[in-house]
Curated annotation (Swiss-Prot):
Gene: nuoH
Protein's organism: Chlorobium phaeobacteroides (strain DSM 266 / SMG 266 / 2430)
Transmembrane segments: 31-51, 106-126, 139-159, 178-198, 217-237, 269-289, 313-333, 352-372
UniProt catalytic activity: a quinone + NADH + 5 H(+)(in) = a quinol + NAD(+) + 4 H(+)(out)
Designated name of the protein: NADH-quinone oxidoreductase subunit H
Role of this protein: NDH-1 shuttles electrons from NADH, via FMN and iron-sulfur (Fe-S) centers, to quinones in the respiratory chain. The immediate electron acceptor for the enzyme in this species is believed to be ubiquinone. Couples the redox reaction to proton translocation (for every two electrons transferred, four hydrogen ions are translocated across the cytoplasmic membrane), and thus conserves the redox energy in a proton gradient. This subunit may bind ubiquinone.
Locations listed in the record: Cell inner membrane
Length: 372
């Protein structure tokens, strides 16, 4: 009964379809006036919630890594080591913030900030439920694809500003990798947009709703959809520098890549940006191909499972669950697949993924035109 009551809540943290609509409805003013401050104030707790969740992504990775290696992982601080990450944050806050003497201090300082901002700006267009979205853009999918480019600037600033050859090598590798893999990733997402007929991420999600649950998801609407789905997942691993594409921070070659010289909270901010990007690409994959906030459970005869597990609160649960599932897969692959060489990385992008992405795009267009 309580679960059904929660699913009927229509006024969660945000009223309306976006923070903009919420602030305007609350005050009666235009978004260009006073409500803009309300939007910022409303976004602050969301950022802290995201930081809290991503912080425990580090704990999750350590536990998963330990499980893969038949270890226990963090166990000392708190029950099952659940407070270990908080202890690490306190430790990093007390660490000395070292800036190399020969570094470009401006670039060295702003690099992690640009990375962090670029990672979290994408959260603005992620529809967490029908009433929980920061900005409902009609080109939200393009925004999510393009915002990754900001991280390239931060990586270059961090690598060049460090005045360290290993940092610069790592930055150049990372930029080449991200820019290259944006092409197959973008084409794969356009296949999903073609199936929905819109670039609005909220509309893409709403078009995948229905009483049959997962059967309405884009991934199961066409046999061709599996191709762009797999291409985007592989390309997204490269975009966020996860194994087997973690060449920019290969420990045996580059120490720690473009953040070799960083310490203290700057080091922590770079890691938070990485985990933020991991969730972002996982959420985009879930929205475009797996229904986003929609429940995957179908109705079973007289039991309306889909209706019982739908609504704003359930929507947040479903999209976060789907996102964290793909984060788990990313962590799993880290201890399963060996690291690729640079030439293998580029070969996979330009001679395998990109041609297949174009093939998937053409086949999706043909399917949408000729198959009712």
């Amino acid at each position: 009964m309580s679960v059904m009551a929660l699913s009927q809540i229509r006024i969660p943290l945000l009223m309306g379809n976006s923070l903009n609509a919420w602030s305007e409805a609350l005050t009666g003013f235009s978004i260009w006036g006073f409500p803009l401050g309300l939007v910022i104030l409303a976004a602050i707790p969301l950022v802290f919630i995201a930081l809290y969740a991503l912080t425990y992504g580090v704990y999750g990775e350590r536990k998963i890594s330990a499980f893969m290696q038949d270890r226990l992982g963090p166990m000392e601080v708190g029950k099952w080591g659940i407070l270990q990450t908080l202890a690490d944050i306190l430790k990093l806050l007390q660490k000395e913030d070292i800036v190399p003497a020969a570094a470009d201090k401006f670039l060295f300082v702003v690099g992690p900030g640009i990375l962090f901002v670029g990672s979290f700006l994408a959260f603005a267009v992620l529809p967490f439920s029908s009433a929980f979205i920061g900005a409902n853009l009609n080109v939200g999918l393009f925004y999510a694809i393009g915002i990754v480019s900001i991280e390239v600037v931060g990586i270059l600033a961090a690598g060049w500003g460090s005045n360290n050859k290993w940092s610069l090598y790592g930055a150049v590798r990372s930029v080449a990798q991200i820019v290259s893999y944006e092409i197959p990733a973008g084409i794969a997402l356009l296949c999903g947009a073609m199936m929905a007929g819109t670039l609005d991420m909220q509309q893409i999600t709403m078009l995948q709703s229905g009483h049959l649950g997962f059967a309405h998801f884009n991934l199961f609407q066409s046999p061709i959809a599996w191709l762009p789905f797999l291409i985007y997942f592989i390309a997204s691993l490269a975009e966020v520098n996860r194994a087997p594409f973690d060449i920019p921070e290969a420990e045996s070659e580059l120490v720690a890549g473009y953040f070799t010289e960083y310490s203290g909270m700057k080091f922590a901010v770079i890691f938070l940006a990485e985990y933020g990007s991991m969730f972002m690409v996982s959420a985009v994959l879930s929205i475009v191909f797996l229904g986003g906030w929609n429940s995957p459970l179908p109705d079973l005869g007289p039991v309306s499972l889909n209706a019982m597990t739908s609504g704003p609160v359930w929507g947040v649960f479903w999209i976060i669950s789907k996102g964290f599932f793909f984060i788990f897969v990313q962590m799993w692959l880290r201890w399963t697949l060996p690291r690729l060489r640079v030439d293998q990385l580029m070969y996979l992008c330009w001679k395998v993924l990109t041609p297949f992405a174009f093939i998937g795009f053409v086949l999706t267009a043909i399917w949408e035109i000729y198959v009712p």
